[in-house]
């Protein structure tokens, strides 16, 4: 699931280098063939394929393997658990890693956990994820309960 080239010591030459993700990405046709196989395996009609993204459980920008089958999955594009939000969370986490405010391991753990907690509880100005329980989503639920209480 992880790219062995990306370590805490190599982040300046890998994920923090502009253009890194594009440089290591497999050809588009190869990725689309994999997506088509996954859609078929799940019984999703090819006509509905545009509603789904080929997701990397650990995004390339956080040291995930660009092409390992164990790192690939499907996510809907839209919604609270959608790829659009996950991609934004990954970019925020990458910024924090590259600024030295989070370790690579912390960012990877956050994105493979309940990453939607990171998306909703993460501040653009702060890289503090210590209050976010990415394993259970507890902080996210507490915040939602407070906002709906009379």
Predicted regions and their residues:
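C-terminal, well-folded lobe of enzymatic/effector domains
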Residues: 9, 14, 84-150
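Structured segments of extracytoplasmic/periplasmic soluble domains
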Residues: 37-45, 60-61, 75-82, 92, ...
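Short, well-ordered coil↔helix boundary/capping segments
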Residues: 66, 80-87
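Betabetaalpha-Me/HNH-type nuclease active-site subdomain
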Residues: 1-77
């Amino acid at each position: 699931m992880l790219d062995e080239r990306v370590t805490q010591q190599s982040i300046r030459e890998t994920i923090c280098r502009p253009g890194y993700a594009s440089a290591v990405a497999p050809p588009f046709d190869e990725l689309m063939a994999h997506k088509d196989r996954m859609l078929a395996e799940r019984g999703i009609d090819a006509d509905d394929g545009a509603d789904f993204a080929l997701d990397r459980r650990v995004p390339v920008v956080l040291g995930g393997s660009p092409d390992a089958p164990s790192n690939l999955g499907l996510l809907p594009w839209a919604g609270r658990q959608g790829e659009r939000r996950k991609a934004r969370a990954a970019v925020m986490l990458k910024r924090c890693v590259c600024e030295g405010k989070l370790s690579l391991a912390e960012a990877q753990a956050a994105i493979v956990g309940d990453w939607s907690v990171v998306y909703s509880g993460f501040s653009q100005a702060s890289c503090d994820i210590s209050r976010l329980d990415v394993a259970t989503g507890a902080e996210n639920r507490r915040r939602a309960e407070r906002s709906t209480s009379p």
